[in-house]
Structures are given as structure tokens and as C-alpha cells.
Regions:
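Positively charged n-region of N-terminal signal peptides that target proteins for export
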Residues: 1-6
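Pan-zinc metallopeptidase signature
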Residues: 214-240
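Acidic/His-rich structured neighborhood in mature extracellular/periplasmic domains
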Residues: 37-47, 52-60, 64-189
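Boundary at the C-terminal end of the N-terminal hydrophobic targeting segment
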Residues: 22-24
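Post-HExxH zinc-binding segment in Zn-dependent metallohydrolases
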Residues: 171-223
Length: 240
């Protein structure tokens, strides 16, 4: 985790610092939930909307307001931490978030409906969230994970943070910091050379190394009591 922490420290140097006071204030704040503004030109699927520091967060009518309240705390904290230029990059590149209701699947999201044509993988079983890219700057997450339902298959993790970390990386940082991916690659290569992240998701590529690292930084990653991993996780799940 030391190597990925170094990269996260780089992000912090860019302005991504943690403010516990701000987080405390966010918990007392309540988001304004409305219908999506017409200016977003969203699919009629979307009935609920809130704005978090310029980032639209939307869902169908099925997602309860309580989920928006919980999501607001997370996304407000994450976006408050970002340097202004990274947040501006996210907003300028059209970053958005969608929350899937408990009984909605990935392919119910209009922007991800095309994945139903993938004959190699059932995306409704595979994913309860996807990260954004410049081509598709939409990050998705799920009601049951945000509200920590017992039925959440990712109950030990915060997938909203993981997927939005992808969006911060791909849509916010990479377009304005050309050397950032090189730093990630060096950090991942060094970790793998030291025998770390074998047989874990974080070792897949720089994208997952970053997103899993951000999860661990915020202490919202899963832990498996195996140094050699189980294919997804090992004993590394905090910034320590």
C-alpha cells in the first residue's frame, strides 16, 4: 500500500486533502432533490436529481431520498477535497453519477443499456457500479451499497467511492496531468516487483490500482486474511 499511498499523496499535493470539519458539516446538510433540469437532456428514465459541486447525481423514481442524502455526504466530501482544476475538469467534461435502485440492473441505466448485447458477460450480475471515462463520463453505484443493506454483495466496501475514483482519475486528473498515469504505472510496477498485489484486483492495471487504493485510503475496502490474496483482496485494506 505504500506505493499507491505515494501516488495518492501526489493527488493530495494537487489539492486532494481531507477535511474532517467539512465532512461534519456535510452530515448536517441536506441535498436539494428535484427533477433533472432539461438542460442535461437526460433520458426519461431519470426522475430524481441533485447537484453536488457541479456534478449531477441522478436516478429513476425508485431510489429513495434517504439514499440521495447518504450519497450527498460521500460525493460532497470527495468533490470538496479536489483541487479546483480537477473539479473543473470533471464538470467541463460532463462527469455525472447515476444511482441504481436495489432492483435495477446495470443495463437498466440508459447509458449502459448497450452492455446487454455483450454475449461474453452478464453485466447485471457482474457489476453494481461502473466508473466514468472521457468517452462515457458516467459513474454508477447502487442503492443497497450506499445504504448498507444486508443483501449488498459488496457489504464490506464502498463501491460509490471506488467507481467515482475511476471518474476522478479518467475524467478529472488524467486530462490535465499528462504524467499522472506514468506515476501510477511506476508505483504499480514497483509494488508488483516487491511481490505485492499478486492475485488481487488492485494488481490488474493502473485504473484498478488507483481505485482500490482510494478505497483503502478512506478505509472502505474489504479485507481477506490471506497475504497472497483471493483474486480480489488480501490483508491490505487501509492506508497503513
Amino acid at each position: 500500500m505504500k506505493n499507491v499511498c505515494k501516488v495518492i499523496f501526489l493527488a493530495i499535493a494537487l489539492g486532494m486533502g481531507v477535511s474532517m470539519c467539512a465532512q461534519s458539516n456535510q452530515e448536517s446538510e441536506k441535498p436539494v432533490i428535484t427533477s433533472p433540469p432539461k438542460s442535461l437532456n437526460l433520458d426519461p428514465f431519470y426522475k430524481k436529481y441533485m447537484n453536488v459541486n457541479g456534478i449531477p447525481v441522478c436516478s429513476s423514481w425508485r431510489v429513495p431520498d434517504s439514499c440521495f442524502h447518504a450519497a450527498y455526504i460521500t460525493f460532497k466530501a470527495l468533490t470538496d477535497m479536489l483541487p479546483k482544476k480537477v473539479l473543473k475538469s470533471l464538470v467541463d467534461n460532463g462527469a455525472r453519477v447515476t444511482i441504481m435502485a436495489r432492483y435495477e440492473g446495470t443495463t437498466d441505466v440508459p447509458e449502459h443499456a448497450y452492455l446487454a448485447n455483450d454475449t461474453t458477460l452478464n453485466w447485471d450480475l457482474r457489476a453494481r457500479g461502473l466508473g466514468g471515462t472521457l468517452r462515457m463520463p458516467l459513474s454508477s453505484c447502487a442503492e443497497e451499497n450506499i445504504l448498507a443493506y444486508q443483501i449488498d454483495k459488496y457489504h464490506a466496501e464502498n463501491i460509490a467511492i471506488h467507481e467515482f475514483a475511476h471518474t476522478i482519475h479518467n475524467v478529472g486528473i488524467a486530462p490535465i496531468e499528462p504524467g499522472f498515469n506514468d506515476e501510477l504505472r511506476k508505483a504499480l510496477d514497483a509494488a508488483l516487483a516487491e511481490g505485492k498485489y499478486k492475485n488481487v484486483y488492485a494488481g490488474t492495471n493502473i485504473q484498478e490500482y488507483w481505485a482500490e487504493g482510494v478505497q483503502s485510503w478512506f478505509n472502505v475496502n474489504a479485507e481477506v486474511d490471506k497475504d497472497y490474496g483471493d483474486g480480489k483482496h488480501n490483508m491490505v485494506n487501509t492506508r497503513e
